[in-house]
Amino acid sequence: MTEGDSARQVRQQLREQGLTPLEVNETTEKAKREANRFVLFRRGASTSELALITRQLATLVGAGLTIEEALRAVAEQCEKAHLRSLVATVRSKVVEGYSLADSLGAFPHVFDQLFRSMVAAGEKSGHLEKVLNRLADYTEQRQHMRTKLLQAMIYPIVLTLVAVGVISILLTAVVPKVVAQFEHMGQQLPATTRFLIGTSELMQHYGLWFLLLLFIGGFVWRWWLTDEKRRRHWHQVVLRLPVIGRVSRGLNTARFARTLSILNASAVPLLEGMKIAGEVLSNDFARTRIGEATERVREGTSLRKALDETKIFPPMMLHMIASGEQSGELDSMLERAADNQDREFETQVNIALGVFEPLLVVSMAGVVLFIVMSILQPILELNNMVNL
């Protein structure tokens, strides 16, 4: 039995052996594997896995291997079955005569429009190795930024959960036991103590309902944002917020500049590059404004002026883009602008977290102090009455 990724490949293998194939049938095992591919491919590939595959492919192509040979080698090096099957299927399409970009287009959930457009440009220009290396750098950079953001958010999230947990335990477990002692005093309790008792009873009786309400509210909010107009309006509001708005604007403008930079360096036309770069933005309002800027560039407006009219990009980035247009080095200036914006984004995140963390600690300490003082106040008043 001869094995291959497609019937055409099996026929070619048989002809190379001096045999004339009359009929090629797919085995049952192969059919089962094909039936399971949909499930495998739905898992896709993580950002780090995609960067590794791209880097390996760039290295092998640079070493002089054909696309088919490079894909075979990459598939053999994949440890996970779904990745190995994915790369093998891309290779089978290449063997059938499709271009690499068209072959990758069969899996848009893994290889997005940016990835495929750059590969197509690299194939046309004959610089596929450079394009793949740029793609690997870009993917690794995005993974690096995502990892740094997650690492920065871990401590505040844990601190918030601990604060909420401690306060909830105090209100639902500690306060009720202490309050039971106050019931036998027969005296007027201070206002702070009465407020604490009311809050504790509210948490005991309606705490679970409150959590359920939060869950339902989150679900309704997600459903509300499924409407394109409402989501775009909300994203516009987000960009206007004091701290979150600056962070969101910095993240999206840096992503746009870096994406357009590598597309421009890969010989992708500017208008097509702007369209693709706009699609990678996470903010719908910013994506709409980029679409409007693309139309203005199509009508003859300079890139700098078109982006300035979006009211999203910072002045420094616009100056660098204008300099790149005048000097003919737009891709390098866009890359520098993206680097500057990434550094500013990291600074803004660090400042925001630097302010949030002590505020959270102080707030938690204030709440705990309020609970303790509300409990101690009637006890101290009782001691004073006894001493008198």
UniProtKB/Swiss-Prot annotation:
The chain crosses the membrane at residues 154-174, 206-226, 351-371. The keyword Iron does not apply. The keyword Calcium applies. It is a multi-pass membrane protein. Residues 175-205, 372-388 are periplasmic. Its main location: membrane. It is found in: Cell inner membrane. Residues 1-153, 227-350 are cytoplasmic. PROSITE patterns: T2SP_F (PS00874). Keywords: Calcium, Cell inner membrane, Cell membrane, Membrane, Metal-binding, Protein transport, Transmembrane, Transmembrane helix, Transport. Ca(2+) binds at residues 79, 133, 137. Component of the type II secretion system inner membrane complex required for the energy-dependent secretion of extracellular factors such as proteases and toxins from the periplasm. Belongs to the GSP F family. Type II secretion system is composed of four main components: the outer membrane complex, the inner membrane complex, the cytoplasmic secretion ATPase and the periplasm-spanning pseudopilus. Homodimer. Interacts with ExeE and ExeL components. This is Type II secretion system protein F. It comes from Aeromonas hydrophila. The gene is exeF.
